[in-house]
Structures are given as C-alpha cells and as structure tokens.
Amino acid sequence: VLSEGNKKIIKNLLQKIHSQTEVLGAEALARLFECHPQTKSYFPKFSGFSANDKRVKHHGDLVLKALVDTNDHLDDLPHHLHKLAEKHGKDLLVDPHNFKLFSDCIAVTLAAHLQEKSPETHCAVDKFLEEVTYQLSSLYR
C-alpha cells in the first residue's frame, strides 16, 4: 500500500517522465529483452529488439504512458488497471512473472535517468511498481 508520502513522490516522478515516455519506455523494454530474452516470445511481430526499433519504441511508449496515466488513480489502481489486467491475463496470457521482470527494468531505467535518487524515491518507485505488477497479474488465467 502506498503511503501519502509515496504517492507524492510518485506523482512528482510521473509528471517528470510525462514527456519522455517513448525514450524511457523503449530503453526499459530493450533492457527486458536483453536481460530476459525469453520475453521476446510475447512479441512475435517484432523484427528487432533494440531501443531504436520502431515497435519497441511504440510499445515502450504505451507502457510508460499507461504508468503516467495512473497518476490520477493512485487510490484506485485495481479499478484503473482492470482492463489492462484482463487483456494481459486472459487474452494475451502473459505469464505474471514477466510483469515483475519488466518492472525491475523500468526501475533501473528510471534510476539511470532521474536526478532524484534518494532512498525514499527508490522505495516509492519499488512499492508503486510492485502494486502495478500485482494488479496486472490479478486476472491471470
């Protein structure tokens, strides 16, 4: 559960990355493919897996924009993320473990680019991504 302090940090962070979703998302997704090559199997239409690839940029942008969109819904993530959880859990059948792998890659990418690297920020990002991961995994069948 995110504390009020965590929410304040996350809101500030999401506002900062709002204009960088394509670059940060592509880097995080490329990092996922590099560190966990088995995840490439969920993207059969991709011809490349680097951060410069058009499809990687597009999907990374979608993911980071979805995170930014949670900014006004931090008190109701289960409801806000329900459709994404349903799509990934029931339609795409993404193994829930992959959400944790990807959230780790997102955290590393954010840490590499953000100037604010306090323990409080790291903790808030970790808790936020853990909550998003939990919600996205909630409808897996």
Curated annotation (Swiss-Prot):
Lineage: superkingdom: Eukaryota
A GO molecular-function annotation: oxygen carrier activity
Keywords associated with the record: Heme, Iron, Metal-binding, Oxygen transport, Transport
Tissues in which the UniProt entry reports expression: Red blood cells.
InterPro entries, alphabetized: Globin, Globin-like_sf, Globin/Proto, Hemoglobin_a-typ, Hemoglobin_oxygen_transport
Annotated positions binding heme b: 88
Record has Iron as a keyword: yes
Domain Globin span(s) in chain numbering: 1-141
Pfam families recorded: Globin (PF00042)
One Gene Ontology term, aspect cellular component: blood microparticle
Annotated positions binding O2: 59
One GO process term, biological-process aspect: hydrogen peroxide catabolic process
Family: Belongs to the globin family.
Protein function: Involved in oxygen transport from the lung to the various peripheral tissues.
Quaternary organization: Heterotetramer of two alpha chains and two beta chains.
Name of the protein: Hemoglobin subunit alpha-2
Species: Torpedo marmorata
Taxonomic classification: Eukaryota, Metazoa, Chordata, Craniata, Vertebrata
